[in-house]
C-alpha cells in the first residue's frame, strides 16, 4: 500500500510539473499592431486631403520617394515618383514600414495602386497608423536600365 501511495504521489507531482511547464504563457511573442487604418488606401476617409510630405529622398536622377503623413488620420504611406513615364513594367516601387511592429506594405499590396508600370509615373502604398510613439519610414526602388538591379533610397523615421 505504501508503495502504491508513493507511486501515485510521484505521478501526481510529475503531472503537475509537466502541466505547469506547458501552461506558462510566452511573453516573447512578436506583437503586431492592428489599427483600422492599417492597409487602407490613402484616399480612405479622405486621409490624403491632410497629407504633408515629411521627407522627399531622391533614389537616382529620375526618381524619388516621399514619406507622406496625414495630420487628420495620423497615418503614413510611401509614394515613389519617376520624373518621366516608365519605359517598362515593374520599373519602380515603394514600401512603408512601421518601426514598432515591422508592419510593411508596398504599392502592390491591397490598398496601394500597384507598382509603376510602362507609361506610369508614380505609385503609393497603403497606410499604416503612425501616431506617436510610432514611427514609419518610406523606402523606394527604381530599376537600373538594362539590368536586373535597382537603386534604393529610404527616408527618415517619422
Predicted feature locations:
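Post-signal peptide N-terminal regions of Sec-secreted extracellular proteins
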Residues: 28-158
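Compositionally biased, low-structure terminal segments
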Residues: 4-5, 23, 32, 151
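C-terminal segment of classical bacterial N-terminal signal peptides
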Residues: 15-28
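Bacterial N-terminal signal peptides that target proteins for export
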Residues: 1-11
